[in-house]
Amino acid sequence: GKRKSKMVKPSKLFALLLENSNRNVAFRDFLALIVALGFTHSRTKGSHQSYVHPKCPKLLVVQPKGKDAKRYQVRELLDMIEEYGLALDE
């Protein structure tokens, strides 16, 4: 049958991604992490969703690949976290 995947808490997902940025991430979990890091949704164009962060000069643009987040977009987020010193708002 269809198993309903449970949401991963942003803090847990963040830890998992720091360990291995190549893992598959459900798009909704990825979005939850983005918001938990302090990003706000600025606009949607087709399947592309743009997020802005007060500390980041550039937009983070994401779109799902099926139900998952695209790997390069996950990596882009991790780069931004490192570059701008973003932290989870727990």
Regions found by a protein language model. Give the residues of each.
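Conserved short hydrophobic interaction patches
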Residues: 33, 37, 80-83
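A charge-rich, low-complexity, intrinsically flexible signal that marks solvent-exposed coils, linkers
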Residues: 7-11, 15-32, 36, 42
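Short, Lys/Arg-enriched N-terminal segments with co-localized hydrophobic residues
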Residues: 1-6
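Basic helix-extension-helix modules of the SAP/HeH family
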Residues: 12-18, 61, 82-85
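N-terminal, well-ordered alpha-helical segments
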Residues: 32, 49, 75-79
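A short, structured beta-strand/loop element
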Residues: 36-62
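C-terminal structural segments of small proteins and small subunits
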Residues: 65-90
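Short, well-ordered coil↔helix boundary/capping segments
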Residues: 24, 45, 67-71
